Structures are given as structure tokens and as C-alpha cells.
Amino acid sequence: MREAAERRQQLELEHEQALAFLNAKQQEIQLLQQAQVEAKKEHEGAVQLLESKVRELEEKCRVQSEQFNLLSRDLEKFRQHTGSIDLLGSSSVALLDVPLAPGKPFPQYMNGLATSIHKGHEGPTGHYSVIGDYIPLSGDKLESPCVKPSFLLRSSSPRCRFESEMDNDRNSNNSKQSSSGKVHLCVARYSYNPFDGPNENPEAELPLTAGKYLYVYGDMDEDGFYEGELLDGQRGLVPSNFVDFIQDNESRLAGTLGSEQDQNFLNHSGISLERDSILHLHSPTQVDSGITDNGGGTLDVNIDDIGEDTVPYPRKITLIKQLAKSVIVGWEPPAVPPGWGTVSSYNVLVDKETRMSLALGRRTKALIEKLNTAACTYRISVQCVTSRGNSDELQCTLLVGKDVVVAPSQLRVDNITQISAQLSWLPTNSNYSHIIFLNEEELDIVKAARYKYQFFNLRPNMAYKVKVLAQPHQMPWQLPLEQREKKEACVEFSTLPAGPPAPPQDVTVHAGATAASVQVSWKPPALTPTGLSNGANVTGYGVYAKGQRVAEVIAPTADGTAVELIRLRSLEAKAVSVRTLSVQGESMDSALAAIPPDLLVPPAPHPRTAPPPKPLASDMDTKDQHLGPHVKVDESWEQSRSPGPAHGHMLEPPDMHSAGPGRRSPSPSRILPQPQGAPVSTTVAKAMAREAAQRVAESNRLEKRSLFLEQSSAGQYTNSDEEDGYASPEVKRRGTSVDDFLKGSELGKQPHCCHGDEYHTESSRGSDLSDIMEEDEEELYSEMQLEDGGRRRPSGTSHNALKILGNSTLMGRADRMEHVSRRYSHSGGGSHRHRPAMAPSIDEYTGRDHLSPDFYDESETDPGAEELPARIFVALFDYDPLTMSPNPDAAEEELPFKEGQIIKVYGDKDADGFYRGETCARLGLIPCNMVSEIHADDEEMMDQLLRQGFLPLNTPVEKIERSRRSGRGHSVPTRRMVALYDYDPRESSPNVDVEAELPFCTGDIITVFGEIDEDGFYYGELNGQKGLVPSNFLEEVPDDVEVHLSDAPPHYSHDPPMRSKAKRKKSVHFTP
């Protein structure tokens, strides 16, 4: 029982202990439950707090999206207001038709835009390589891409800006852009750390990273800074020459990749525009598809780096495992823009041979077998197969096997010009970026998956060494150490020597500032910052019409100049071209620009102020004073490009290269053309006989001429109030050109002057002007006619006339060019006393100290002279009243004119020696000693001369006379001749006035008048048209053909000795 009681007590004690332990456990459980509840509450509170923060962030995101959309709408409105932006460079054009996929949101485009533009690097010698940094998205002028701007200084007084000329142009464009809106989106052109700059408060400026976007507000301040804001909200000052404005969403950037299929020579991402927009690049050569941009070698390819015409390519190819007989490679899918197209599969290639094709969606890995990596090297490539073609295999490639190194292989330089070249290579791994060195100086970095590079702004005829250094994205541990260390490859090349510059573009012709000129405009060719085009130093531009330079401007950047209409009309030019002038020569002609027809029509002449003329008895006798209807001007008065022979008579064609362009051919002025085809022996024999006969005739004429001059020099002059009179038989003289006449009369030689008591002066209006002597000049357009008697001079002063002795036809043809060259020289030695009106002295313009009158016409005064109609004069010299006239009112009262210009004159000259004349629809005064009269007795002849506008001074007088005689009813022998060859003067004639010659075909029968002239030409008629025909193209009609020939020798009727003739008048200013 005792044991049972002890047992029971023990059990109760254990029970109590168990209850106590249980209570303790229960309390512990309660504490744990309470802690759990508290932890749950705390968790719920934290979750609620996080949820509220998330809601706040979402709200901020929504607000920012709305702000961004608002800015996008503002940009769109701005684009609509300003219109499409014309980004025309000054030369070659790169057309980018690579728009983004339709429907792609602009914010999505902006998210990746920052990766597509990067900083450029300056070349070793001031030359800059790629045009990718050269994307001016605003303004009209483009400048060199790679010149890094100098810092802008902000100071209280004075404010200084040190910018290059290029950046000044850009900033001026930027200021125009910034003034048209409140907020503008910009992209940083260069990286900028304010603390490295020269300004005292760098904390007020924003740090910039090349290619990143930012906003600017308002206008640029006077120091050249904008107030800007980065995309992260940071605000501050932004230097204007470190940013580029983004015009609108048309200027979207998209990557364009180098591919052999589309000949894309560029090595970086490019700009993509919508399909209706074109980007014009300012570069010496045309680039096909994009603008290069310098990247840093990242492996991440943004969707926006894929252009519309670029096939997306696989990315990040990796060598997973390399075995003795096989390799395993992997890659990532391509970045395909929405709506671009579909990618159906991948092709895996080994040395350009397709080994397998994997469907899209399967694992992007491939096991390539049947390789011998221990003994051979293989190029593994992966390309995408899409609905728009396959991607470029070199954009996803790597080398495996034996002797693989990091350095690229097969460096090549192609498309070498004077200032550009294209570099290409094969990368060891498409994930590698590459650093380009030019002449041992780092030039640029080419991003991954690019293997081509374009050099620009190189120097002509210079040797370059290019080094390409590969930069692996990660260390290729699978390669041995010595193969890993081989990272660079080199190539050398030389640019071409400087060649002729490029011609201007877009040549146009429109009305000029005055009625007497037209404005020719063009777009200059692309010039480097140093003013080179194709390596040639551009100096200016020349305007050409029918191969002759009619205007010139010396300015490399000129885009237009004025051209005198008189020159164009005298050449009968319908179009003009422009050439670029340089030290190395002229460029090719630009595209022809048509001259508007309304500008070429001469203005209608003013109504005549003189009363109708009275009929004169001698009117019918002055027909011989007319210019022939076939004598026209086909070249400029200023220069003639037709060369001529050095001797007087020749039937064989002269050497066409004996005289350079721009020279007037010595007399005779007409050159016999060369017939094309087999010569006819009889024709040659007859031509030689005619030439011999001409020499004999010429010798006789010279003897008679010499005899006449001796007789005339021995004659006595009339004194008192009578004009000079001559008595001599008629002498048939050889044809002398108008230029020879002028040379023999006023300019040809130093005259024999009478000084002292032998010379008496006459005054005009009491002025002390050097006397204007007035005599009748023997008319050289007709046979020399000596007449007795004369008329009384209006002045009572008597004087002795001065004459030049010698044969004007023989007076130094060799020095004729010298005469032409010095005709425009100005001595500047004479002093003038300004009077109300003065006639300029000839000696001012010819560089001679003394000049006397030479030949004067002998004519009679008609009582009705004041009622004569308007007369036609030809200018003997160039005359510009502004620079050559001593009169103070010259600019308003006197008319300018050019040598050889036809001038319409009303009435007689006044007491001061001035005519009242009209040129270019303008009335004014004409100095009488600068012009010479040409008589035209009928309206048709006068109208023809006025329409012609110019009379070439090398027009042979005998041919003018012959043309005149052809219209008179004199008895002239005629013959019929057959043409042996086809002849078109405009194509075959070496002469200037091709309109004076007749075209004909083989077998045509031509009626010729008179004998052959000293130049080897007949005057003939064909199909009602009259003109000159070359004798060596003709043969007389055989005897068995019926022809009517005159047996009488050719002759011309002469006027009776005492017949009154209307003479040319000319006043010469004489300085004793």
C-alpha cells in the first residue's frame, strides 16, 4: 500500500510539472502568435506604402508622357509653319530614302536615338575623315564636320567668343532657328565638362555627352549660351556651338550598315528620313545610303539603329565550345523594327557555304561538324532570311580554328580620289570594335558589326598609312597569348594628284539689275575648309557662251554674276555655262542654262527726234556705203577665238593651233576651211593657179597704192577756210579691215605732226579744251576718189591738215596684236580743266602723248543737214563716262559704250564735240572723237545694223564693199560652179562670222559673182541666199554644160570723179 501511495504522489508531482510546462508552452505560443500578427500588420503597412509610391511614380510617368507628347505636337506645328527643311550642301548629294516603319511612335524612336550620333575625331593634319559628324539639321550652309569648337567664354566685360569660322556660320543658323519657338530639342555634338572649361562658374553650366538629347529654352544670350535642360531634369547653361537643333520628326536617325549589296561604304549608323524627304550632304563624293557616325563599339543594337533598307542581322555571335572536329556557336535574335517585315529563318554558313538552316523560334544555337580546327581556319557566319532578303553575313561572324588572331584581315583601300578613300576589312569577330589610325594618329572608332570606313578631306597627291586596331568586347581566352596580342593590321595608299575642280551646279539665268544685263546664278561645288575642290585651289568662276568667256568673278564662294546682254546678243547665244576656275585649271562646263528668249530681244528703239529727211540728189549714189547683209557678228567684240594664218594669201587650210584662243587673227581675217574627203587633182591645180594669179594682182595693187601715196604726199593742202582736196586717178586698193583702217588712221603709228606756227587752234564755247580738228576723211570703204574743191568750214580758223604717209594695208600686221593689247591702256598723265562739257581725249585711252587726225572725209555741206534722219555710228574705243570723262555730269549725261558697238545718233554734234545718241534704249551724249559714222541709206540696212548691235573691227573692208556692190546694179561677171564637198560653216568654218558664208551640199550648183578674193573665197548665190563660199570646195561647171559666162575681165564701176558722196565724219582730239 505504501508503495502504491508513493507511486501516486510521484505521478501527481509529474502531472503538476507537465501542466506547468504546458502552460509555459501555451504562453510562448501566444507570444509567437502576437508577434506574427504584428509582423503581418507591419508588412501590410509596408505594402500599402509601396503601393502608394508606385501610384505616385505612375502618375509622374503619365505626366511626363503627356509633356513629351505636347512637345512632339509643338515640333509638328513648328514644322508645318516653317515647311520642309532644305539641307542642301554645295556639291554632291547623298540620297537617303530609309524611312522608319510607319506607325512607329516618335517617343520610341527618341529612346534609342542617343546611340546613333557620336563624337568625331580630328585628323592628324587638319583633315577630317567621316561625314557622320557633319549633319547640320538647320540652316542653309554646311561646314566641315570634324573641327571641334573652341570654348565659349562668359565674362562680365567684355564678353568674348572664340569660335571658328565654321561654328560662327552654324551658330548664326542656330540663332535663326532658336528665335522661332520657345522650346527646342537638341543633340549634343561633343562631350563637354564645364569644370574643364575656361569659365569662372562651371556649376552654372550643364555637362554634355556627345549624342545625348536635351532641351533649350528661349534665345541665345550675347555670350553664345542657351538655357537648357537634360532629359533627367538637370538645368543650366549650354554652349551653343556644342549642340545641334533637331528640326522635327522628319530628322529621324536610323542605323545603316555597311553591305556589299547596296555599295554602302559607310561604317556607322545613319540618318533615316521619311520617304518624301531627301538629305543632301556636303561632301566631295556621293555616298549611297547614309551618313557615318562614330560609335564606341557597344554590342547592344537598338531597334532604331536598323534602317528601312537594312536587313536586321543576328547579334552577339558566341563560340560556345570548340572541339577538334566541330564547334558550337550561339547568337541572339535580330532587332526587327515593328512593321519592317518578317524573319523566317537563320542560315549558318562556313566560309560562305550554307551548312544548315534553322527556323525562327528554335534555339539560337548550332553544332557545326566536319571541321578540322587543328589544321584549318574557318569563318562561321549567321544571317537572317527575311521577306526582303538576307542580312549581311559579315555583321554576324567569327573565325575559328588554327592561327586565329584578334587583328582584322584583308585591309583594302578603294575608290581613292584626290581627297577621299574607302577602307574595308574582314573582322575576326563581328563583336569587335575597331580603332582607325591615320599616319599613326588615332582618327576614329568604328562600332561593332561595321567593317567599312570612308575617309574625307584628305590631301591630294599624299601618301597615307592606315592602321586598324581591333578592340575585343571580352578577352578571347581560347586563343594563345601571342595570338591574342596581335590586334592591328596596316595598309598604305596615296591620294590622286590635284585635278580640275568640279563644275558648278544648278546654273540659272534671269533678269539682271539693269535692262542691259542678265544675272547668271549657280551653286558652287563642294569646297573643303581650305577652299579645295578635287584637290584644286578654287579661285573663282567664269561664264561662257559659245565657248567664249563673257564674264568672270574672282571669289571661290561666289554664286552669281551679271553678264552684259550686248555680249550675249553679239554672239547670238541661247544658253550659257559656268566653269570653276582654279590654279590647276578650269573645270568642265556645267550644264547649259537657257537664256530666257524675252531677255535676248533688243529693246525697241525710241522714236526719232529728228524731222523726216529731205530727198537728196546724191542719195542713190551712197549705196556703196552700206554694210553687206551677210556680214554678221558671231563672236564677242572683246575677243575672237578663231586663229588665223600669219601670212596674207593661202588657199590651203592653216594650222588651227597656230594662234591661241582670245586673239584676233591677223589680216586676212577669213581662213579657208579644210575640205573633208579625197582631194581632186584638177581642183588643186586650179586653186594653185588662182593663188598665183592673186599674188600677181596683189603685187600690182601694191605698186599702184604706193604710187598713189607718193602723189598724195606731194600734194598741197588748201588753206584758209577750205577743206583738203586731192587730185589723183582712182586706184583699186586691196581689202583692208576696219581694224587696219583704225590702226592706220588714229592708232596705227605715231603721226607726223605739225607744231608751232603751222598749227592753229579753234575754240569751243570759249573753253581752253584742246582743239577738236574737223576734216573730211577719205572714205576707205570705197575706191579712193580724189575730188577738187570743198566746202567752207563753219569756223573761220584756218589750219593745216595732217596726213599719215604709207600703205595702210602693209603697216605692220605683226604688231597688230600689240596694238590691240595697248588699245585699252590709260596713260593717266593728262590734266583736265573741268568745263561744262568736254570731249575726252583719245590720248587718254591709247597711252600716247600726242595724237593727230589722220584721214578726214571730204564732203559737202547740205543746207538741210539739220533735218537728216538718225545716223549709225560705230564705237572706236571702249568708253565709260564714270572713269574716263572729265565732265562732272558725265554719269547722267553721257553714254557708255564698247569698242565696235553700233550707236544711233540724232543730228549733228554740238559745239563741245558731242553727239546726241542712243545705246541700249538710253539717250545721252556721245563724244565725237570716240565714234565713226557708217552710212546706211535704207531702213532695212539700218535695222539690220541696229539688231546686230556690234560691228567686229576685223571685218574686211573689201568684203563689206563686195557685199555692198552685190546689191547694186553694176555689171559683174557670173559663173556657175559645182560643189565637190558638203560644207556647213557652223561646223567646218574656222572663221568668226560664219553667217556670212553659205552652206551647201555635194553636187549643188552655185552662182558666183566676180573673181576669187585674197582669202580664197567667192561671193556666190544658192537657193536665193547669198554669201561667201570657199573656193577649194568648188569646181567650175564643165564646158559641156551650158553656162553663161562673161568674157570681160571682172571689174567694178567707179563713181565719176566729181560725184558728191556722203562721207563718214569723225572728230579727233589733237594734243600738240
Swiss-Prot record:
Residues 620-635, 730-743, 754-765 have a biased composition (Basic and acidic residues). Plays a role in the synaptic transmission as bifunctional linker that interacts simultaneously with RIMS1, RIMS2, CACNA1D and CACNA1B. GO terms for molecular function: structural constituent of presynaptic active zone; voltage-gated calcium channel activity involved in regulation of presynaptic cytosolic calcium levels; voltage-gated monoatomic ion channel activity involved in regulation of presynaptic membrane potential. Residues 1060-1072 have a biased composition (Basic residues). Pfam families: fn3, SH3_2, SH3_9. Residues 599-615 have a biased composition (Pro residues). The modification Phosphoserine is found at S720, S728, S852, S859. Residues 597-681, 713-800, 1044-1072 are annotated as: Disordered. The modification Phosphothreonine is found at T861. The SH3 domains mediate binding to a proline-rich motif in RIMS1, RIMS2, CACNA1D and CACNA1B. This is RIMS-binding protein 2. Interacts with RIMS1, RIMS2, CACNA1D and CACNA1B, and potentially with other Ca(2+) channel alpha-1 isoforms. It comes from Mus musculus (Mouse). GO terms for cellular component: calyx of Held; glutamatergic synapse; plasma membrane; presynaptic active zone cytoplasmic component. Keywords: Cell membrane, Membrane, Phosphoprotein, Repeat, SH3 domain, Synapse. Belongs to the RIMBP family.
